[in-house]
A protein has these predicted regions:
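Metal-cofactor-binding active-site regions of metalloenzymes
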Residues: 2-513
């Protein structure tokens, strides 16, 4: 199970390279077969990782756990996540992954970080919280010192405290939770196509908007989001944030600078409570439905934010459904502005989150690389673009793979068929992330790690695969080189502790696995 020593690897490679007989002649040579198999293993994610003796023992145990899950009559990665989730939560492999240090989460959206139960059971019970009900059976929330002004296509605002006295609070809370997530008992019936699921997906963000943008809640929400990721053994987070205006109880609006200062304040407070947490940074995002003039303004805002908040401002991105938004090439004049002014504004573009081959949107990955993106968000379409894939590899641009998101949003049904399985087998630069975990009733990274580890890698992926993915998460982060080195050293120390205390101590091994 462990990676071979480099000497033996090179020897096997020599067998392949120096053996001059054609593959098709005579009887197949077992040595050549073994060499080719090892060459495939070496090329994959984790293929260059050499496991120590402790890791080899742990890897053997992990292999046995994987065999148990593979033998199940229902294999979770082949099922829709909403149906697979209970099976995943019973899996000892999932328990292993929960306890494993996972490094960084590099693709997470601001309004989908925190479990919706916390939003409903905590935030909606606070004073001055109003609700209205829309014509399409959704809800909106607003905090106000007095009766809010009527909102188009919504009922009269009702103080939640008053409403709860008139009806069953449990049923009301459950209805709010349903509006804040995409969960459905029969997801294929509820979401027959991408248009339907994307409409529901974007509506869920609108439901959360009035809660999360209330200034006091904004800070509490961010703190709770960091806490939930930290409890999943994540030490660093990069948050894609729209930075909409937050509002006060009297209706006053705050600027983006206020939001960034709030992020700094929350992060400082969080690190004081959890000193081993490395930190968090913001990738400022705008919707890809903007016109060019609006995009220019947004890029200029990003440059200003980077100048004013260099410690937490990581870069810029567009969000929203690629298939219904404008392609990156449309925005090139806006995106070229920083370089023309001698300013380096890092880009972290969503690209290739589509199955619409041959369209303008299908060129977004190529254009992202031409615009010198630091990473590619999703990259689902990459295996259909060999030149893009080769260029991304040469530029060392990692793909942020979000398995559950791609499945729920109907790009793929069986995760064994996800294009990232090919990227993983080829050792393409990649990280695993969770995109919008709260909307999928997931949390942190463990669920997505499970789907990738079991679905993409099958029995070939092992502890070395996991270790490489975890280290990649810091390697491809926006941290400075010095901070990356420091964070990676801390991560590897946590990794060693994870091995020793949780899985190699005989008194704990059975309890933990």
């Amino acid at each position: 199970m462990g990676a071979l020593p480099w000497g033996r690897r090179l020897g096997l490679l020599c067998v392949v390279l120096l053996c001059g007989t054609p593959l098709c002649c005579g009887r197949p040579d077992p040595r050549r077969r073994e060499a080719l198999m090892q060459l495939e293993m070496i090329r994959g994610i984790g293929g260059s990782v050499v496991l120590n003796d402790k890791e080899k023992l742990l890897d053997e145990k992990l292999h046995q756990l994987k065999l148990q899950d593979m033998a199940l009559p229902e294999f979770p990665p082949s099922m829709h996540f909403f149906k697979a989730k209970p099976l995943i939560e019973r899996s000892p492999v999932f328990s292993f992954l929960q306890k494993m240090p996972k490094g960084a989460a590099l693709h997470v959206h601001d309004f989908a970080m925190v479990g919706v139960e916390w939003l409903v059971k905590n935030i909606t019970y606070r004073e001055n919280c109003y609700v209205c009900f829309t014509a399409d059976n959704s809800v909106r929330f607003l905090f106000s010192a007095g009766q809010p002004k009527p909102q188009t296509h919504c009922s009269t605002w009702i103080l939640l405290e008053t409403l709860r006295r008139k009806m069953n609070s449990t049923e009301l809370d459950n209805s709010f939770i349903r509006n804040l997530t995409l969960f459905a008992e029969d997801p294929d019936e509820a979401y027959p196509d991408q248009d339907v699921v994307w409409t529901r997906f974007e509506q869920a963000f609108l439901v959360a908007y009035g809660l999360v943008t209330y200034a006091p809640i904004f800070k509490d929400y961010l703190y709770e989001g960091l806490r939930q990721f930290y409890m999943d053994n994540i030490m660093y987070v990069e948050i894609r944030a729209l930075l909409p205006p937050t509002y006060e109880l009297d209706g006053r609006r705050n600027s983006k600078d206020w939001s960034m200062r709030a992020c700094q304040e929350v992060l400082q407070r969080f690190r004081a409570q959890y000193p081993d947490f490395v930190g968090a940074r913001v990738i400022f995002t705008v919707h890809r439905g903007l016109n060019l003039t609006e995009a220019v303004k947004a890029v200029e805002e990003a440059v200003t934010l980077q100048r004013n908040f260099p410690d937490i401002m990581a870069g810029f991105d567009f969000v929203g459904r690629e298939d219904s938004g404008r392609p990156l090439w449309y925005f090139r004049e806006a995106l070229e502005l920083p370089e023309e002014r001698g300013i380096h504004l890092p880009y972290f573009f969503h690209a290739g989150e589509t199955d619409s081959e041959g369209t303008d949107v299908d060129q977004n990955m190529m254009d992202a690389l031409l615009l010198n993106t630091s990473r590619i968000g999703h990259g689902f379409a990459m295996t259909r673009h060999p030149v893009v894939k080769e260029l991304a590899r040469k530029m060392d641009v990692a793909v942020e793979v979000c398995p559950i998101s791609n499945q729920v949003l109907k790009l793929v049904s069986d995760l064994r068929n996800h294009p990232a399985a090919v990227l993983m087998a080829e050792g393409h630069p990649m990280v695993i992330s969770s995109d919008d975990p709260a909307l999928f009733e997931a949390s942190g990274l463990s669920y997505d790690f499970y789907q990738a580890f079991m679905g993409f890698g099958g029995m070939r992926s092992n502890l070395a695969t996991l270790k490489q993915l975890v280290v990649n998460s810091l390697r491809y982060s926006s941290l400075s080189s010095a901070l990356k080195d420091k964070a990676t050293a801390a991560l590897l120390e946590k990794w060693d502790k994870f091995e020793d205390e949780k899985y190699l101590n005989p008194s704990l091994r059975q309890a933990c696995i």
